[in-house]
Amino acid sequence: MKKQILTLLLGGLMMTGAFAKTAVVYFSATGTTERMAKNAAKEMGADIFEIQPVHKYTDADLNWHDKKSLSSIECNDPKSRPAIANKIDISGYDTVVVCYPIWWAYAPKIVYTFVESQNWSGKKMITLCTSGGSGLGRSGKDLSKFAKGVDFKGGKDFTRGSGADVKKYIEGLLK
């Protein structure tokens, strides 16, 4: 019995560190952002959730050279909010790391759908992206404007970073 109580107490102390009550929420159309998000969540011991679109994006949908592709149409429509197939509840988390690819210098509109569907009051948001070269830009700050009551801590492009790199970066933001 004493051993069980000690185990519970020590486990509770471990969860009071920088990543206690941290969730990683990601959207990935090709797998690049998914790998980064999973590596980061594993390093931090954070829970992870995938933003799943109702209609999965095809290669044709993602063709940024085609102005009629779904991703091009969504990015050019400020009111576009693609539907999400799964329910993600961040109510039990203090810090939410939102991961996404960069599309036309912005987060994909489905990420806005997620952000607008949550209660961010009293929560910290960190944004991480993957990019073909344009980097994070203003995408994190733009997203945080749609998260009422959030404490936006910052964001960074981690296309080539490891999970340990992400962990170190986030630790710095949460100090």
Model-derived segments and spans:
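Active-site-proximal alpha-helix that buttresses catalytic centers in soluble enzyme cores
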Residues: 19-175
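Positively charged n-region of N-terminal signal peptides that target proteins for export
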Residues: 1-4
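Bacterial N-terminal signal peptides
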Residues: 7-15
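General helical structural elements
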Residues: 6-7, 85
